[in-house]
Amino acid sequence: MASHKWLLQIVFLKTITIAYCLHLQDDTPLFFGAKPLSDVSLIITEPCVSSVYEAWDYAAPPVSNLSEALSGIVVKTKCPVPEVILWFKDKQMAYWTNPYVTLKGLAQSVGEEHKSGDIRDALLDALSGVWVDSTPSSTNIPENGCVWGADRLFQRVCQ
């Protein structure tokens, strides 16, 4: 199981991200923000979004086809709210996304693929493990109020 957690921390290669397009709900906001980074390894050293939220530049990637321009996906599980970052090598930009929508979409995409393989199976096991102990929840922006561990991420003040 430790290898699965490590797998979620690495950058998923372009071949995986192109093969498994993300299924997204049309009315759910996907992108939280963007930051120019010269190398993908710098994503791991960035502090969690909730600790530096106001210092970022927010925008969706200015690309027409995400799956063709996308170089990789980074999942940071050490943050209070897991972070999913899309990396665009050509633009040297990292885009932070709604982790619940992105992970759920990636798991659905990988699950619908009928091919088998070691990488696919390990990825599917790791992604499905995220949802094992979770209760069903909405992927919409939370209502006003306190969100534990993410008060600054959702611009809430926990009292």
UniProtKB/Swiss-Prot annotation:
Localisation per UniProt entry: Virion membrane; Host cell membrane; Host Golgi apparatus, Host trans-Golgi network
Annotated segments matching region Interaction with gH: 23-148
User: Any transmembrane segments, and where?
Assistant: none
Q: Write down the membrane topology.
A: Peripheral membrane protein
Task: Describe the location of the gL alphaherpesvirus-type domain by residue ranges.
Answer: 27-159
Q: What are the GO cellular component annotations?
A: host cell Golgi apparatus; host cell plasma membrane; membrane; viral envelope; virion membrane
**One GO BP annotation of this record:** fusion of virus membrane with host plasma membrane
The protein's matches in Pfam families, at most eight in alphabetical order, are given as: Herpes_UL1
Q: Which UniProt keywords apply?
A: Disulfide bond, Fusion of virus membrane with host cell membrane, Fusion of virus membrane with host membrane, Glycoprotein, Host cell membrane, Host Golgi apparatus, Host membrane, Membrane, Signal, Viral envelope protein, Viral penetration into host cytoplasm, Virion, Virus entry into host cell
- Per the annotation, which location comes first and is thus the protein's main one? virion
Assembly with partners or alone: Interacts with glycoprotein H (gH); this interaction is necessary for the correct processing and cell surface expression of gH. The heterodimer gH/gL seems to interact with gB trimers during fusion.
Q: What is the protein name stated in its UniProt record?
A: Envelope glycoprotein L
